[in-house]
Amino acid sequence: MKGSFMKNSTTTSGPKKVTTKVIAAMKKGKTRIACLTAYDYITAHLLDQAGIDLILVGDSLGMVFQGHETTLPVTLDEMIYHAKGVIRGVDRAMIIVDMPFMSYQANDEEGFRNAGRVMKETGAGGVKFEGGERIANLVHMTVRAGIPVIGHLGLTPQSIHQFGGFTPRGVTPDEAKQMLRDAKILEEAGAFCIVLEKIPASLAAKVTKSLKIPTVGIGAGMHCDGQVLVVSDMLGLNEDFHPRFVRHYAHLSETIRRSVSEYVKDVKEEKFPVQKESY
């Protein structure tokens, strides 16, 4: 292992290293793709040990790590910083880095160079861009240079002010038709996977069936080829955020509060440290 935090092996018996070929084969073999976000070494290390396939260093860190209301304030330098820590903790999972707001929207050449910078400075397995037809040329340029790309359709958080809120997308016939078209365009441009966020399950099923490349859903129903959640959401660290597409597999906020309260009590009452915890 690259770090010394833990030495336990992963619980999965799958491939030693997840690559784009492995992800493609999972769709063909009807094996669901498990993806979570991570923003630091220790969390990424634990996810890798647990057998996660994809780790997304998401610009969602702007909300869950930095406390912003949107992902928009996150910078490219911040994404690179967090990605470096994540990559040090992982042996098996494929790591994808979100390209943050305004790192690629100005023009394709700037986006292409910034994607290259992410790959060179972090060692990530690929990058993710939000958008459909408008980023097709950028995706093509990036893939042609040897950089794997994941697309992102539906609710795209970097366009939150344009949408007017975190409401589901693809709910009208015109939106659904355009999303199907965008998905095919991204596939033809060379994307190896597409994230579908907060769209009707029936539409996600149609998109998934229409593509040779896999889809990974978040709030997009059960018919995608894989699922992704923000790790702090599924671990129950944010009690104030509970949309119906999030399942809490733990309630760590309660555990952390209780543990810290016990620590504070022991320190105040001079019960920590004791002799066996001293040198």
Predicted regions span which residues?
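Alpha/beta enzyme core
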Residues: 2-250, 254-279
